[in-house]
Every structure is written in C-alpha cells, then in structure tokens.
C-alpha cells in the first residue's frame, strides 16, 4: 500500500544522538522514524509511526541498537556528554524539551548546535556539561567545539540514558526512534535504533 511518509527528520539532527558508523548507500535519503513496534518478522520490523501510518523497516547485520532508559538530573555531572532538543528563549538561553545522556564510549557524537524538528523552532545541542546548577533553575552549560549553550531543564522534561542494546529489545509495543535510509524503491533500512526499555518512550 502506498503511504505518505510525514516523519522525515533532518539527517544532521538525527546524527546528534545516534552513532553513524554504519555503511550507507551514497544515494539513499536519510529519514527518521518515530513510533511503536507492532510486530517483528525476522529482519523486518513493522512500526506504527506517530503520524498513524504503518511502515516496514528492514534491519541488517550492521543495524545498531541502543536502549533508552530513565535517568534523573542528578545523574548528569560536569563532564557528562549529553544531547538536548530545546526551544530558544528571549534571553539567549534554551529550554530543554528532553535530555539524553550518552555513554562514555559515545562522547563526541554529533558535537555541536543545529536545527531540529522535534518541535517547530527547536534545536539540538550535543556537548560536554560544564557548569551544572540543580538548585537554581536546573541550568546546564553545554560546551561543544566552537561554542556553548545554557540550557534550562524544567522539572517535567524527560531525561534518559542511551545504553548499549541488542535486538532482544525489539518487540511488539516497544517505542522506537530510528535513523534509516530510504531506497529508490521505498524500502526503509534501519541504520541505528534507539529502543525504549521497560516501557520508556524515547523522547528525542
């Protein structure tokens, strides 16, 4: 069945929170898929995306899987490497929409500040936490090559960890955010998947 696909994300934005060390077809557009797994059939993953469409995503031996688990603001320390989708404030600071904490092995992933489409006007900042003020507005200073951003983290903003995972995480009902390539024939092939563990919804 022919489907319109309305969940395309900027490839550079997705690169901000997913490992990109996967061989890619040079001419395949990069897309993002957000939704819930409805079924697994071997290397085929059936997903109902957030816009309501049903899509089939193919996995390869190179598809990387990360677990997304709950975290707390107290888990973030100076020197932690994080990513945050956020909205701009009039004073030049950012207000976080979500925070994801990378494992040490992924430090440096997507370093920088760029546009993102989690919400209209949002940005993605990936970098190393410098100053961390929890008692006064929960404000993080995130430093990256060429700049830094001050990010205010409201109490209700989801904070998660990205952890090593495997295909055992991929089962019906699991919420996923993935980075994929869409071939000329419409085939979608996952390159990196962030899968919610224990009912967690990846907030990216």
Can you describe what each PLM-predicted range is?
Residues 2-7, 17-204:
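Short, flexible, surface-exposed loop segments at domain boundaries
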């Amino acid at each position: 069945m022919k489907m319109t696909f309305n969940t395309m994300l900027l490839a550079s934005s997705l690169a901000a929170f997913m490992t990109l060390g996967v061989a890619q077809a040079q001419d395949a557009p990069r897309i993002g898929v957000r939704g819930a797994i409805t079924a697994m059939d071997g290397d085929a993953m059936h997903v109902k995306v957030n816009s309501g469409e049903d899509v089939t995503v193919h996995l390869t031996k190179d598809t990387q899987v990360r677990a997304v688990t709950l975290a707390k603001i107290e888990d973030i320390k100076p020197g932690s490497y994080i990513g945050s989708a956020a909205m701009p404030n009039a004073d030049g600071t950012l207000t976080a929409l979500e925070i994801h904490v990378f494992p040490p092995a992924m430090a440096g992933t997507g370093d920088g500040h760029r546009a993102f489409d989690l919400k209209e006007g949002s940005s993605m900042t990936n970098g190393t936490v410098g100053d961390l003020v929890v008692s006064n507005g929960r404000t993080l200073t995130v430093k990256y090559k060429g700049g830094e951003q001050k990010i205010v983290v409201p109490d209700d903003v989801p904070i998660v960890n990205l952890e090593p995972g495997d295909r055992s995480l991929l089962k019906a009902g699991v919420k996923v955010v993935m980075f994929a390539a869409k071939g000329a024939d419409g085939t979608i092939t996952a390159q990196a998947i962030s899968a919610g563990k224990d009912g967690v919804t990846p907030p990216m």
